[in-house]
């Protein structure tokens, strides 16, 4: 799908 896991980005950016 064309969906982005922002949750992972937020956690990773932490």
UniProtKB/Swiss-Prot annotation:
Example of a GO MF term: oxidoreductase activity
Keywords per UniProt: Cytoplasm, Oxidoreductase
Keyword Isomerase applies: no
Enzyme class, first EC level, given as a word: oxidoreductase
EC number(s) from the headed UniProt entry: 1.12.-.-
Localisation: Cytoplasm
Any GO CC annotation of this UniProt entry: cytoplasm
Top-rank lineage group of the source organism: Bacteria
Keyword Cytoplasm attributed: yes
Primary location recorded for the protein, binned into one broad class: cytoplasm
Physiological role: Soluble hydrogenase catalyzes both production and consumption of hydrogen from suitable artificial electron donors or acceptors. This subunit (50 kDa) is required for hydrogen production with reduced methyl-viologen.
Subunit structure: Heterodimer of a large and a small subunit.
Name by which UniProt lists this protein: Soluble hydrogenase 50 kDa subunit
């Amino acid at each position: 799908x064309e969906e982005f896991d922002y949750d992972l980005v937020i956690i990773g950016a932490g």
